[in-house]
Regions:
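Active-site glycine/GP-rich loop and adjacent strand/helix microenvironment
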Residues: 1-176
Length: 176
């Protein structure tokens, strides 16, 4: 079918380059990534440009840093570590060195699009055990709490899969 869409901006959940290609092919659009956090302002913290080699951080509003997740030591540009933001224009609920738990890399290399804003990579993982399933933050400890409350033994297995581009989470419990 023909549609008038030319561009799609996607965020809220990590997606792969394979998923980008599938979205672009199936919808006939150019797909761009956007990064945000509920704790900051939602979407709009960083955005992908036409070069699509990382996301430019909106440095008019945020100071990004990469730290060692274990020591809190600030790491140089190009090093992989935990992404931290300080908000500089948010007045009602400012954030100082907010630990996102997302593992990323920051780069000040010149972008072919001409922008000079620092770029962040797509998150490559997390520094905690949080899972993001269909846009919902899930901690294994939350699952364990529910299982124990319902009288199940603490022996369980969490299986995460992707079926037709939809995350699934199954919990297998050992019955006693």
């Amino acid at each position: 079918e023909d549609n008038d869409l030319r561009i799609g901006i996607f965020g809220a959940e990590p997606w792969t380059e394979e998923m980008r290609r599938e979205i672009e092919a199936s919808l006939g659009i150019k797909a761009y990534d956007i990064y945000g956090l509920t704790e900051t302002t939602g979407p709009g913290v960083a955005f992908e440009c036409c070069a699509q080699h990382g996301m430019h951080v909106n440095e008019d509003h945020f100071i990004p840093e990469i730290i060692d997740p274990d020591t809190g030591e600030v790491l140089p540009d190009g090093e992989k570590g935990e992404l931290v933001f300080t908000s500089i224009t948010k007045e009602a609920f400012p954030l100082l060195r907010y630990r996102t738990r997302d593992i990323c890399v920051l780069s000040r290399e010149k972008c072919s699009c001409g922008r000079t804003l620092i770029k962040m990579s797509k998150p490559m993982g997390r520094s905690d055990d949080m899972l993001i399933i269909r846009g919902v933050n899930v901690f294994p400890s939350q699952i364990e709490t529910v299982l124990l409350k319902e009288g199940y033994a603490p022996n369980y297995q969490i299986e995460i899969d992707r079926v037709r581009n939809t995350d699934t989470l199954d919990v297998y419990v050992e019955l006693t």
